[in-house]
């Protein structure tokens, strides 16, 4: 089966934004205008196509990134057909993992900002994630019809708060109730949308007289930005030559793909204005799979290898999401980077060292499935029938192996104990939690060895609430949930050298392992580093991995309060062995003993997670809010003014933030809002550390 759309006409994009910026509504409009849905679904009716989990429809927020495909021929029907694969990503901070994994497999993104709220905390988080993966993006300033809408203020914030280089390619005609349409600066034409056809029809007109001067000035800035794309455009521009619309588009495209600029558009998705022009911009400025660099990975023999986005290269794909479907079982969402995959093919998973057969292939339209026989380079699809694949695994041609770079997932910062309400549900709960953990790498399940309780950990209170909710709905398990626990860590402050010796002489063969370790602190975020400093074979090399393993096991149980130890480097620099009695087990125990003893002497300290918190409050409550933040050991880092009042930016220990939503509501009569995300670990003050240690010992 030949390709229906050339790969140059593919656009794999994500829609990313702060919660409530209107992301899902924008996606719904895209599906409406591209003809996928014939009736617009509204989020506030709980009818949005992209929000297909029950909890999403109840809460009005997007939790999982649904993928969908649509086709676009341009606003005026003049384009050849483009295939746009859209991933709608959640804007709530507890689900940043969904955003992270979407960005890893996208080629471009549309960042949606609220014209009133502007750049909000989650916008910064998502923008940083897009920077990390080098994703070219354009910005759409939504909700231009709302009271307090200010397009140029948002453009300014993209520059000052996100460090982007925004280039407006449109200006709004009016704002708030007076928002009528936009001026297309390329063609210097006003675009008016027809309300009676839900914005399906539009007309072009002259720029309103009172806007001509502003439009000329902003167009000049846009043309200059485009001219910087190449020497010949710059030369033509400097010599006073007029750049054609096509040349401006080409220049803007080159610079957007290089992540040098961000084209900015505006509109109101809810009022059906501006979304088709944004789709045109997706085609004009965002990359196709062939515009992105070849994907890089590790090939046979550990050498770096790369794959071009084309059908005749060997097959390679990345599994970026696992979802359980009540009808077909496990769906594995994949992004195909190269080659062709047909249903029935066998693929190799180098991460798990397993071959698997692809049962069926489906392309998703939110939660509707369309079965396809094959997928090609650039496609996003879901495979049914894969048994042992987790998020971030590579799938490739068994004859031409490549391992693509894995995704990095944040460590959970909050834990709660859960137990089923009836003993009979114990096994069901275990199965449910393991399935949910397979879907979501930022969610962990473990059993506390001392208490025997099941502990679940995640990125925030809402994250865990939704997990417990899904357990009840999808698996029929009712659970009691304990009080939230903070995920503390431990580290050391000074370097020590420590001996560990494990000797057992019982009749017959004994046990003998002997090591010397140098244990030293690393900078925050350094993790764990093991260095083999053995010379002359005083510890045989077959026992060295066992020493490392023993240390890693001991790292999980810190010496102060049993929390994981982070940011340490351990060097194995000496030791001895016995020809007969030495074994891997003996060296593992010796390594573990040496680390435990050494950590005690290395000035261990307790680390606590610090959250970055932003509170938006009406001015009259500001004193109370700041006072409360100070009482919670928070440090205020700055304040901004917004139409809703004041934005207070601060850092607060997570342990002080439980129940904050309720307290903030009562202090401000429900008028303030806040958002928070994990920022860093810092050393806990002595009185906090003492209390935590005392509690863990008791």
Curated annotation (Swiss-Prot):
**Predominant subcellular localization, coarse grouping:** cytoplasm
- Please tell me whether the keyword Nucleotide-binding is annotated for this protein: yes
- Coiled-coil stretches: none
Q: Which PROSITE patterns does this one have?
A: G_TR_1, G_TR_2
**One Pfam annotation, family name?**
GTP_EFTU
Q: What does this protein do?
A: Catalyzes the GTP-dependent ribosomal translocation step during translation elongation. During this step, the ribosome changes from the pre-translocational (PRE) to the post-translocational (POST) state as the newly formed A-site-bound peptidyl-tRNA and P-site-bound deacylated tRNA move to the P and E sites, respectively. Catalyzes the coordinated movement of the two tRNA molecules, the mRNA and conformational changes in the ribosome.
**Name of the protein in its database record:** Elongation factor G 2
Write the lineage as a comma-separated list: Bacteria, Pseudomonadati, Pseudomonadota, Gammaproteobacteria, Methylococcales
